[in-house]
Amino acid sequence: FWAAYQKADEAETVSEKFALEAIAEAKLMESGVMLPLQSKGGNYSISRVAPYTFDYTLWGNDMDRYHNAVVTTELIKASDVSTMRAKWAELKGTGEYEAWAKSYLEEQGYTLKDTYNYQLYTQDPTTWDILATSQSVDAEAIVNTYDGLMEYDGEGTLQPALAESYEVSDDGLTYTFHLRKGATWVDSQGRKVADVTADDFVAGMQHMMDAQGGLEYLIEGIITNASQYISGEVTDFSQVGVKAVDDYTLEYDLEAPCTYFTTMLGYNVFAPMNRSFYESMGGKFGVEYDPDAADYTYGKDSDSIAYCGPYVVKNFTSKNTIVFQANESYWNADHINIHTLTWVYNDGSDATKAYNDAIAGVVDGTGLNTASVAAAKADGNFDDYAYVALTDATTYSGFFNINRNQFANANDTTKAVSSQTEEDAARTKQAMQNVHFRRALAMGLDRGAYLAQQVGDDLKYASMRNSYTPGNFVTLEEEVTVDINGTEKTYPAGTYYGQIVQDQIDADGVKITVWDPTANEGAGSSDGYDGWYNADNSWEEMSQAVEELAADGLTIDADNPIQMDVVYASSSEVFTNR
């Protein structure tokens, strides 16, 4: 995998990079270290939120911005959801859908409101520093507190945010953004801190590279000297390709033309940060950066960040609620639909709590698990309000620990204590180093039965995903020729990413299907079927593993089994059943 990935990293064109990354992904799946399980969506849901009234794109953080959500006081009927989805497809790209959705809902007798009680969250943010994290639990909350340069709307169109306009140099190496004047930073009490300027994006990027929260790789090889600064080869940040030409002109210099550069701006690695506020919280840059310093408080709580987005956090009660209130100083305050955004906590111990809260209006929607589907059918709400949620690019995977060194809960060693002896652990570790053993496990898991514990048998394949990256995530922009196991293969423009992944897997003789060109009514898909689970293939892989491990001195048979531990949250009925 790593050799294939490095080759992709050196690609000269975007399409070549996509094709080589597809080959690398095939190698990673063949390794059996990570098993793709499901996407987000594909389950029954009920909601008061009109579909497609916030970003739906398959990348970045904009999908978690809710200021333009259209929310009603009543649950929206499934038939109306279907009508609105069809109308969205008709109006996509015109900029007219949101206004139409509001008008349609009012014509159908719904009442619009300016509050949104977000579907139950299950984990507190671990930091409020958007530039020092790669965790979705953090970004999903913090993204509502700042604006980026540009932002996707509900129709999938990039719209100006803090940047009013931009231009690209003829050689494609320089992007120049012109920032709007009048945007401000405020503290958690709404008091002005400073004006938003181009330097905020310079400071933000340097802090992101200093913190190395896990997403810095996104700009490596893209922005000039980003890789070198992150590795320490370059220590003078002025040599990195991000510059404030003046207070309202921001310039990015790229190592090579990148046609998708503006589509990356929704990722939190491009978030701004006010330099003086950061320094007032003990923050430093470069070699002096030390998040463990006694006086470093930036991002430790919601009071220790500055805000330039549609909301400020007015209340954060751990494992209870997070309340976002409209930022009165927000540059676009007159054009947001939601003035109070409230996140409600749910630990998952009560399988029907989310459904009951949605019916009662405590939250404005929820996905339905098997228990809540039964409840909805029993009380008559299912037929009227339940619809199948759309899937997105999120992929949830299962991970095999091939180098385990922890045998109890790291935070409380009296919990989740493994029954393995030292000999058991050594045998399991040796077995897990064998690729055929790992493949046997991956091919032996009935993912349909696994997912059915949450969504029921009728939807168990609806959200099932067979690859890490959805096969239809991108298509080649131009013809590309790549080497697949010594044979040159040419792919025309328009070829799906997933097709290249599957071709490499087939060439390697690994019996999994991660791209089916006949799926999704002939459009092709990586979703909606189980391309991994096969008892015969699993047994074939295990037989080879047993033979190879025996040659290495490890006997596996009925009297000498390999013991596997699965750690799960026993408070959750779904996790327990899985």
Language-model features and meaning:
Residues 1, 31-50, 371-538:
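Local pocket/hinge segments that shape ligand/substrate recognition
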